[in-house]
């Protein structure tokens, strides 16, 4: 999927912006506060239904306006898709797919795979396991059609089982508790099979990328499924039942899964510098882009915010080259032109200048 045109209304300082990006790489230049990152934020809304800068949608709406809207025309296999999203100040959402309106964000975002690399991207390695689970699940959402149904079912069952744990009058042997635990084990095992299969695909891609991005290190990658080795999930749930009943929540299962990175037996986070961690993240994100292309023939839209702050000149060039090899459409922001000195070699490119919320294409 490639963006042919983008329209943005009342999003931060972008009051009325329309531009036609290149299907290759788009460089967006502007000083801090000009609105260049808000362009990426608008595209991110189409791919995720939310901002990467704030959890409060009303903060994104321009002052004295009731809502913001992002609309795009996309090209896929010579077919044009018209997609739109609007969020109001009272937090309601409306999506539009080829003129048909609804409020199911997942229908929209499934059509437009978007990834983003920002100054906060290292959080996937430094933050909680939830962020690394999201990494796997993003790829599964776009590759496996039945994944979302399974994941949502597991989340609902986990919430219900946690509630049962907190009900002192419901003991573990109670038939109601046994029934819901069995269902949890069923969907949890299915979810784990999805993730195991995806990691089997991703690990060779990540390893290959690291050979180019961090050749001086041997990074060991492993997937922890969320419970003890040698046990089925229903056995692990039975084994932990007394503890879970006492604590009031389920302590084992795919909601405790993690992806672990080690170098010489030590966590990679303790060995690598901040810049090296960014290159590990770049290898991870490139791998999901490659996986998407290999297994679905879908292309990804990739947002690279503040390229000068995140990657040195040589690394940013290699990263962009590899993304373009996967037929990715890129949007790259920078503050100063010297951060983009390497761009002359790219044929399929456009340069945009942003100033006070106005976007101008360089001829």
Swiss-Prot record:
Function: The RecF protein is involved in DNA metabolism; it is required for DNA replication and normal SOS inducibility. RecF binds preferentially to single-stranded, linear DNA. It also seems to bind ATP.
Location(s) in or outside the cell: Cytoplasm
Primary subcellular site in the record, as a coarse category: cytoplasm
HAMAP family: RecF
Record-stated family: Belongs to the RecF family.
Residues binding ATP, per UniProt: 30-37
Source organism of this protein record: Pseudoalteromonas atlantica (strain T6c / ATCC BAA-1087)
Keywords attached to this entry: ATP-binding, Cytoplasm, DNA damage, DNA repair, DNA replication, DNA-binding, Nucleotide-binding, SOS response
Bridged cysteine pairs (disulfide): none
Gene name for this UniProt entry: recF
Record's protein name: DNA replication and repair protein RecF
Gene Ontology cellular component list: cytoplasm
Domain of life: Bacteria
Signal sequence interval, chain numbering: none
GO biological process, one term: SOS response
GO molecular function: ATP binding; single-stranded DNA binding
UniProt-listed PANTHER family: DNA REPLICATION AND REPAIR PROTEIN RECF (PTHR32182:SF0)
PROSITE patterns according to UniProt: RECF_1 (PS00617), RECF_2 (PS00618)
Pfam families the UniProt entry points to: SMC_N
């Amino acid at each position: 999927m490639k963006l042919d045109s983008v329209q943005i209304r009342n999003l931060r300082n972008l009051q009325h912006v329309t531009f036609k990006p290149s299907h290759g790489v788009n460089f967006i230049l502007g000083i801090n506060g000009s609105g260049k990152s808000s362009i990426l934020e608008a595209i991110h809304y189409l791919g995720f239904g939310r901002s990467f800068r704030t959890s409060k949608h009303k903060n994104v709406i321009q002052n004295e306006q009731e809502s913001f809207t992002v609309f795009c025309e996309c090209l896929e296999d010579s077919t044009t898709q018209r997609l739109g999203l609007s969020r109001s100040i009272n937090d309601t959402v409306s999506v539009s797919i080829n003129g048909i309106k609804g409020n199911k964000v997942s229908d929209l975002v499934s059509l437009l795979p978007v990834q983003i690399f920002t100054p906060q991207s290292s959080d996937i390695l430094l933050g909680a396991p939830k962020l690394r689970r999201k990494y796997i699940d993003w790829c599964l959402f776009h590759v496996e059609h039945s994944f979302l149904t399974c994941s949502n079912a597991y989340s609902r069952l986990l919430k219900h089982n946690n509630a049962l744990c907190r009900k002192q009058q419901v003991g573990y042997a109670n038939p109601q508790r046994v029934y819901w635990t069995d269902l949890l084990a069923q969907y949890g095992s299915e979810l784990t099979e999805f993730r195991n299969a995806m990691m089997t695909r991703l690990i060779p891609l990540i390893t290959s990328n690291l050979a180019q991005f961090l050749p001086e290190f041997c990074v060991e990658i492993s997937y922890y499924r969320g419970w003890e080795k040698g046990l089925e999930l229903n056995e692990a749930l039975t084994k932990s039942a007394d503890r879970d009943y006492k604590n009031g929540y389920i302590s084992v299962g795919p909601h405790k899964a993690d992806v672990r990175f080690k170098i010489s037996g030590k966590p990679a986070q303790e060995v690598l510098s901040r810049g090296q961690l960014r290159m590990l993240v770049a290898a991870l994100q490139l791998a999901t882009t490659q996986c998407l292309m290999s297994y679905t023939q879908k292309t990804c839209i990739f947002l690279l915010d503040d390229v000068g702050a995140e990657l040195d000149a040589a690394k940013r060039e290699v990263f962009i080259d590899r993304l373009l090899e996967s037929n990715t459409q890129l949007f790259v922001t920078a503050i100063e032109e010297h951060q983009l000195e390497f761009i002359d070699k790219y044929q399929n490119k456009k340069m945009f200048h942003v100033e006070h919320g106005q976007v101008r294409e360089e001829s």
